[in-house]
């Protein structure tokens, strides 16, 4: 049995994942857990969730939308099966807190025991959910933000009003985007930009060497989020491209795309199967931060489609990760063809150097603030 140097409690997106099949959200916690384990740090994921009724809100919304956008019982059933697979992954692969909490008051009354408390990563600071700012942590215990994301370039005055004092109470703050550093500075808080946890571990830490591929034929894989406008996907172009490549098209979509994508292309996977499809895809199309991250992890050729309309604020995360790895030319716009982007080689040696440099910054951060 391992002897751990430190006990860390992490609050992240547990409540969100209970209602949404979001691959990036679940893997960012898993990756941070695996990373900390390498330093003999025992971590637990605080099971903080909203009241029970809200757990079913997403399913109700999907059911109503399915009726509005076309009768899609198959899609609803697939969502339920995938949600079951997500929960199995959480219970089998993630260290969870012994207790569940459904209010900040209960967290304050009886928080999980730990030497250090961490919030992050993902968009834990996209709003002012009090628990994500670690206000429940007992006096004298260290509070750290790791790669926390605001999910936007600037905050409203209302947002600042709610969170400024909470952020100022942290012992150490790191954020995921450079815009987050500026936001923290505007609150009088010193912050540094660090890697998303998913980039702290390697491909082999997600999938064992030699794992058998699930799809035997050639396929193009897409991961989309937040869009409900068919035209924003350039889906006809992607379909045509996959046909030219003699590859089938597989699309995973959440938060909207699953309601408009033709069912013959739409798939929902367990977390493990989703990774497998990333690993063996011919190429990737995505409009998400973690869609880009896993293209990098599995060294896949990829195209990025920017989000539009209300969801366009999410592009801040996309610009940030592409700039970090010098991959801004992967954005598919009206002036570029899919073939031109996919044919353009990616310098994976340079990607590896950038990743290693930024991993050292994370190592230094935790060595300083976890004393490991």
Regions found by a protein language model. Name each.
Residues 1-372:
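Active-site anion-handling motifs in enzyme catalytic cores
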């Amino acid at each position: 049995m391992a002897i751990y140097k430190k006990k860390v409690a992490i609050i992240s997106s547990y409540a969100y994942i209970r209602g949404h099949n979001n691959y990036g959200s679940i893997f960012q916690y898993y990756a941070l857990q695996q990373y900390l384990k390498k330093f003999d740090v025992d971590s637990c994921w605080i099971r903080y969730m909203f009241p029970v009724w809200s757990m079913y809100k997403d399913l109700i919304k999907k059911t109503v939308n399915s009726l509005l956008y076309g009768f899609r019982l198959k899609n609803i059933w697939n969502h339920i099966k995938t949600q079951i697979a997500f929960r199995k992954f959480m219970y089998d692969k993630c260290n969870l807190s012994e207790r569940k909490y459904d209010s900040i008051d209960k967290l304050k009354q009886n928080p999980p025991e730990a030497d250090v408390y961490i919030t992050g990563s993902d968009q834990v600071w996209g709003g002012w959910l009090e628990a994500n700012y670690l206000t429940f942590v007992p006096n004298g215990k260290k509070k750290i933000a790791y790669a926390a994301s605001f999910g936007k370039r600037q905050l409203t005055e209302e947002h600042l009003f709610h969170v400024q004092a909470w952020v100022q109470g942290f012992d150490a703050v790191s954020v995921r985007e450079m815009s987050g550093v500026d936001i923290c500075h505007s609150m009088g808080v010193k912050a540094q930009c660090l890697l998303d946890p998913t980039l702290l571990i390697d491909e082999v830490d997600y999938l064992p060497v030699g794992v058998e591929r699930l799809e035997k034929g050639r396929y193009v894989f897409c991961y989309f989020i937040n869009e409900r406008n068919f035209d924003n996907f350039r889906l006809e172009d992607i379909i045509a491209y996959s046909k030219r490549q003699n590859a089938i098209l597989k699309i995973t979509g959440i938060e909207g795309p699953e309601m408009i994508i033709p069912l013959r292309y739409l798939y929902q996977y367990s977390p493990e199967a989703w990774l497998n499809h990333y690993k063996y895809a011919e190429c990737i199309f995505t409009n998400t931060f973690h869609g880009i991250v896993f293209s990098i992890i599995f060294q896949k050729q990829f195209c990025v489609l920017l989000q539009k309309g209300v969801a366009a604020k999410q592009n801040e995360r996309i610009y940030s990760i592409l700039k970090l790895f010098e991959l801004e030319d992967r954005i598919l716009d009206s002036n570029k063809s899919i073939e031109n982007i996919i044919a353009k080689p990616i310098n994976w040696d340079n990607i590896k150097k950038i990743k290693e440099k930024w991993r050292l910054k994370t190592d230094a951060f935790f060595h300083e603030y976890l004393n490991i």
